[in-house]
Amino acid sequence: MNTSYSQSNLRHNQILIWLCILSFFSVLNEMVLNVSLPDIANDFNKPPASTNWVNTAFMLTFSIGTAVYGKLSDQLGIKRLLLFGIIINCFGSVIGFVGHSFFSLLIMARFIQGAGAAAFPALVMVVVARYIPKENRGKAFGLIGSIVAMGEGVGPAIGGMIAHYIHWSYLLLIPIITIITVPFLMKLLKKEVRIKGHFGSKGIILMSVGIVFFMLFTTSYSISFLIVSVLSFLIFVKHIRKVTDPFVDPGLGKNIPFMIGVLCGGIIFGTVAGFVSMVPYMMKDVHQLSTAEIGSVIIFPGTMSVIIFGYIGGILVDRRVPLYALNIGVTFLSVSFLTASFLLETTSWFMTIIIVFVLGGLSFTKTVISTIVSSSLKQQEAGAGMSLLNFTSLLSEGTGIAIVGGLLSIPLLDPRLLPMEVDQSTYLYSNLLLLFSGIIVISWLVTLNLYKHSQRDF
């Protein structure tokens, strides 16, 4: 009996180790290229509107793929989908590295990488729920969460070092390391019974077309892209109202508090993601820092602070003071952006402090948004609603990166708005930081109103 229990426990621990490796490299793949965006822009002589698609392409297929893999896990089985995701991710890495001299191939490779990497967060949680004993699941989820946070933290530092001392193209090879998990996971995971079900491919295609063309509009400002996007979304909404098992539950659209919470959360998450994508350009133009310095000195401390702030935010929410946590988070965000807009020209170390408070504020805000949104859902809506929140959060990050790239490439925000004598190189970035602060405050006011009018006990 004890031997059987020990073997089972060992198997569970082995599964958890390989899941942690997949989770780490999934996040790392998302983070490492961010600090190299200015270098990529210089290599291809492209504006930020085009260059930011290196990250936007990944986030686009990553967010959509996360939802798709979750839908398919019962129909095709976890083992098969994990293997598919790992192979696709590695295939994208090879294409990107071999074809890194061609911008179109690089973007295509990032689309492919995102489609593969999306399998990891979508399926890792399902594996934990199915294979790890109930009494150990909390520890397992906590460990994976810590590994993900560590990946987000060290990603910019690793990316900056490799890009500065070797070349940014080698960052594309990092996900290939995940191939080592294949034989172990295939051996450890059981053969599953496939459940027949309907998969709404038409709905996914319509939604994806709408999203892609909207992002193209945000970087090119072509009205034709916007028209295609709007038409695709209208057809998508009509489609999900007719089918029996839609990709997105149309009933959630009638839950106004939920939709407002998701929208405001998405705007805040997208704003911060856009800011983080802007930091490498800003530090190069204003302070002439190297890629290694931007990754390890400027961004790294902020990404690591997320672990601490996220833990504190969770404690505040558990003690039933989410409004207090929300106010702290929004204060950190808005004041940090506002302060940075006025003091951008000061020492580069100042931006390190700003990023610590920005990402710390985001940790507080994420925790509270999740609480508020979940509290606006009925019990039968919880699964679909929280999945939609997760999908929207990921998608908004890619959208924020695309929008900021577009704003960095047009002269709209070039004139000086602040009444200060500063170097002309700071005008654009100061204006954007001022805009970020305003967006955060408006989103906060709407969320605050939603919170106060909620009839549920948080």
Curated annotation (Swiss-Prot):
Annotated localization: Cell membrane
Disulfide bond sites: none
Main subcellular localisation: membrane
Coiled coil: none
Keywords: Antibiotic resistance, Antiport, Cell membrane, Hydrogen ion transport, Ion transport, Membrane, Plasmid, Transmembrane, Transmembrane helix, Transport
BP-aspect Gene Ontology terms: proton transmembrane transport; response to antibiotic
GO molecular function terms noted in the UniProt entry: antiporter activity
Membrane topology: Multi-pass membrane protein
Keyword Transmembrane helix: yes
CC terms in the record's Gene Ontology section: plasma membrane
Signal sequence residues: none
Pfam family, one: MFS_1
Transmembrane regions listed in the UniProt entry: 12-33, 81-100, 111-129, 140-162, 165-185, 201-221, 223-240, 256-276, 297-317, 324-344, 346-365, 432-451
PANTHER family in the cross-refs: MAJOR FACILITATOR SUPERFAMILY, TETRACYCLINE RESISTANCE PROTEIN
Purpose of the protein: Resistance to tetracycline by an active tetracycline efflux. This is an energy-dependent process that decreases the accumulation of the antibiotic in whole cells. This protein functions as a metal-tetracycline/H(+) antiporter.
Protein family membership: Belongs to the major facilitator superfamily. TCR/Tet family.
Protein name: Tetracycline resistance protein
